[in-house]
From Swiss-Prot:
Region span, Disordered: 1-38
Protein name: Coiled-coil domain-containing protein 89
Lineage: Eukaryota, Metazoa, Chordata, Craniata, Vertebrata
Cellular localization per UniProt: Cytoplasm; Nucleus
Major location category of this protein: cytoplasm
Positions bearing Phosphothreonine: T12
Residue ranges of coiled coil: 19-346
Family: Belongs to the CCDC89 family.
Gene designation: CCDC89
Organism: Bos taurus
Amino acid sequence: MPQEESAPRMDTPSSEEPLDKQNRKLEDQEEEMGFKELDGLREALANLRGLSEEDKSERAMLCSRIQEQSQLICILKRRSDEALERCQTLELLNTELEEKRLLEAEELKAKNQQAQKLEERFMTLASNHELMIRFKDEHKRQNAKLREENEKLRLENDQLFSPALKAQEAKVVQLTAQSEALAKELETLQRKYAHDVCQAQAREQELLELQNRQACAHTEETEQLRMQLQSLQQQQQEALQQTAKAEQAHSQQNQELRARLQTVTREKEELLLLSMERGRVLQNKQAEIRQLEEKLKMADVARRHALERFEQEAVAVNSNLRVRELQRRVDGIQAAYDELRLQSEAFKKHSLDLLSKERELNAKLRHLFP
């Protein structure tokens, strides 16, 4: 029996094999040992039947040895089960630790990326700050230089130009002020016209909404009257005795419908009167625009006369710098006048568009209420 016990111990698998395979091999070896012990017990019992007292005492010793071996086997099996449980627990702990390690690695990677982005942003901000400082210094330097040049030019202008040119400059300033006043007047008229147009559009929208509501109400009333008429016809077919009463109610409803139609007709006439009044307002605005255009033409003529006088007087002056300065101012006045003329044309075009829209609206109203 000791030889049989030593044999399975030599067949124990190495630690390099997986734990589940080792457990299965241990279980198989224990089963084989149990079968072998049972076979040995059967053989021993068969031999004991034909043995003497000495053999029986020897058999008792063998039985005690067998019990000891079985106890040892139980102890070994219990230890192997405990070792298996410890291995499984260690595997679970290892798995949890591996998952935690992966999570910590991902968090560390994310924090590293965030730190890298913050560092890149900080470097970008630092470079932008340096560029801003350089730009500010350069701007200060150029500003100081331009101020010095401006002061020099002002002193030269004070020394070079005569009172005649100053008077001419005063005339140019006066013409510029007149042009600005005309521009402000035009802007005021434009704002007033825009306000009137907005009010007219709002009134038109209100009238259209009122018309739509009245049309819907009229349609609903017509539908209700039609349904009532059908009901009256059915009642007439069912009960011939109530014919007189039904005709009287029907005539009353027709009278109410005529009265409502007359009310709608009066409202349509009021809408037409409002549209005509709006047309008169637009005509008045167009008259104001024509007056403004005449003023612009007069200002243009005055500007041309001033330019001619300025050119005649500028020929006698032997200073290219002052002539260029005055020419720049004249060009500025010309640009302002061109811009004012373009605004006037745009305002005129907008007025024509509004007039065409009003005509279309009047045509639609006439089509709806012939």
